């Protein structure tokens, strides 16, 4: 056990975590240069296309150190985006140490701080690593100063590397072996293993990712999940060496996988403890706090025939994405579907893309919302995350919406535009402080609903990419909210309903009506699109009807003949309008999202 090192790489987005993982894998000779490809641990197409890590990935490396001993290194590459913090915290629970990666030109950013606090919470040994030292804009002395002042770490221990060029990788491996502690655990105690992730294999069932805390396990042994007492027999165990590599067993301190023919997807829960049936441990491992969803949206299959496939796909995706929460939902306009909770808008996009790509299901996604707390006239409280469930306003005493504390780190020359952006989003300026002579941390309290759509994108464009943003949830606060309904041909479409602040309601209604007009195809009759609060219409757009030229066969002659044909056409259209149902395409629901992004 003394030769095992379990560690994660944590950093802000784009500071080079996956590239550093690539170099460590190459330096230890796990993959030959011929078979190597960049971002080797990012095995989803969507990760490669976007150039981001979404899933934490584990890899087992063998390293022969300068002292002549061979060490087992278990590396977990983590995501950097604020939406995937839950992935990071789960990875850290399986480690004793962390490499805190900092870009030599960008310096310490918001997620650097957030990830440092996470690592400190888990009592990890932290090694600061300054990456991208090959860049012309690299300022190593400035970053060392930030490590001392902003992070409170010893900058003398910082390792200088260029993951792209491969500089300093051997020195880093030596520091990992010397500085990081080996895992603690009792090899002779009853088996206690923490599930920190899992994924589904169509041939082998659920593959469980485990960190062995105490004891040992080997194939053919009977195991039990402590949260639900489900029992299975181990078929295979081993390490992740990019692909699965089976081993005759796993020992205390090791990180690996087990396959036990688990076909019931719901039996495997992240944070659960595995023990042996014949000799169980007394107490489970302290797991993870449940991920709290921040953004809610409904997902419906475009074709109702795909509903059963969607149920199956969500179950399997939940295995691999523990922060996804969902429950059954139905809509008069869209049929049966699911109300899902996500950690942010990027998380929503990724889930949508994975469902469509990996499971081949065409989806309709409704506009994302947050959860609101309603205090009714009788004093009772109700929490809703779906605008369609908003009760009659006369029953509501007041409404509360969630607020966040946002930490925004920017160069001070962008202070004015960022302040303006936050004020436009109903922000409250709480504090600001200079981190260095020209870098500023601004603290704002903002309504979550104003942030979930495009706040981060706007911040990045205002600050030309130099702004970074992190947030934590605060409380619910009183707010003047109204339910905005949309009517198409005087029929309410529940899936288009939104809860908005009264001051923004009219502008939002106009924009949405305009977008709907652009995306609903022209019909044989006139279509009215209305935005309304209660019974009061506050915005309207009209889609004109197709008009067939019924007078084409009249050559000259009396005008009354033409008039008669036109009147006849009008009557036919009137009748058609009464029975005509307007088909609302997927594009119209997406249009509501687009409105938010403008």
Regions found by a protein language model. Give the residues of each.
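Structural and coupling elements of P-loop NTPases
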Residues: 1-598
